[in-house]
Amino acid sequence: MPSRRRGPSRQQLSRSALPSIQTLVGGGCGNGTGLRNRNGNAIGLPVPPTTALITPGPVRHCQIPDLPVDGSLFFEFLFFIYLLIVLFIQYINIYKTVWWYPYNHPASCTSLNFHLIDYYLAAFITVMLARRLVWALISEATKAGAASTVHYTALILARLVLLTLCGWVLCWTLVNLFRSHSVLNLLFLGYPFGVYVPLYCFHQDSRAHLLLTDYVVQHQAVEEAASNVGSLARSKDFLSLLLESLKEQFNNATPIPTHSCPLSPDLIRNEVECLKADFNHRIKEVLFNSLFSAYYVAFLPLCFVKSTQYYDMRWSCEHLIMVWINAFVMLTTQLLPSKYCDLLHKSAAHLGKWQKLEHGFYSNAPQHIWSENTIWPQGVLVRHSRCLYRAMGPYNVAVPSDVSHARFYFLFHRPLRVLNLLILIEGSVVFYQLYSLLRSEKWNHTLSMALILFCNYYVLFKLLRDRIVLGRAYSYPLNSYELKAN
């Protein structure tokens, strides 16, 4: 029989019909991973750099309007008035009387037991609460400058008189408190300072020495400056750190850094480190000052109450928690304004994020060895520290194994995350206070809730105003900004 020409086998046909994987992915499976055949041997394919595969486009930022922010002196004045109001409310909760009863006791003719109030303690608390306002007043007067020698001399004398008066009142109240109270009670007066020293002095960073304007220089100069700053910070003694931290504590006018949109991955990471240190310092200042205010306003008066005096412990503790939450939100709103949160959002957009993958997945996908000098596009798989990661952001220069980079991206890649959290906290407090106001049966509960609500309405109004304006600004298409700019 005549032999027929046999066609290609099914296996050969399937192999010849498929294009090469190098053509599909552009040869991007490289840097030691590559493709493997059935025997497990690697197929040597030429691997172009990652930038030849996909070039990440430039990061485009939204333009937000300049929202009004309270000045340092005005905010400190409002914050001081708020603390005085809640201090007055706490004294009402402790020393209230049933003044509508018949006059069987001399104290029942007044709404408070004024003869039980320690006025030296009240004066001491007032001076401690006014420390930020006094320093803000001095700072604003110093910024104004002196037009003549007489003006400068009068300014110096006014500062000396003001500081001397505050110091004299503080010493006078302390001497009288030492005479009338035990040593155990007096230890409560300085407890926040015992927390302040380890919080600020033992965890000093180089935030005050690193400026974001330094990121425009070359990377080598930045590294040399950082190493010099680190050696200077390590050579400081404890007294220098204490004085520096006290100066930063009283300096309310903290400048907001700027964003320079760096193109180098090293510069982006350095900018993130500086912003992260600055953000941690601001949060530390918010936590300390809010706890400091709540401690002296709501907790310290309870420590000096006589054992024979009855007061509602649950309501006083609830008042303490409310004061701390409100102070925390007010300080956070002032120290983390919208411009600052937008700056953190822009830096997070340049940083990117990596998602850790389990072993066994994406075994046939192109994989790369992570390099610190590469800007990785979205969806790229890299290997770092024997783990597999996938790029999640449009720009990715973060270290895959660095948890702090992942936290930074999680907090700030959405620009309204911090603002939404503050609105949720303050709104929950306001709704709870309204509910307590409706169900209150005692006159001191009604008065305290009504006064605090007036203060919280102002804070909630500012938060909602910023949320509405920024929400519309961030939802605006980026192409519209480009057309408007052109």
Swiss-Prot record:
UniProt keyword annotations, A-Z: Autophagy, Endoplasmic reticulum, Glycoprotein, Membrane, Transmembrane, Transmembrane helix
InterPro entries: Uncharacterised_TMEM39 (IPR019397)
Cellular localization per UniProt: Endoplasmic reticulum membrane
Transmembrane intervals: 72-92, 110-130, 155-175, 182-202, 285-305, 317-337, 418-438, 444-464
Glycosylated residues in this chain: 31
GO CC term (a single one): endoplasmic reticulum membrane
Record membrane topology: Multi-pass membrane protein
Quaternary context: Interacts with SACM1L, SEC23A and SEC24A.
Function: Regulates autophagy by controlling the spatial distribution and levels of the intracellular phosphatidylinositol 4-phosphate (PtdIns(4)P) pools. Modulates (PtdIns(4)P) levels by regulating the ER-to-Golgi trafficking of the phosphatidylinositide phosphatase SACM1L.
Family: Belongs to the TMEM39 family.
Protein name listed in UniProt: Transmembrane protein 39A
Native source organism of the sequence: Mus musculus
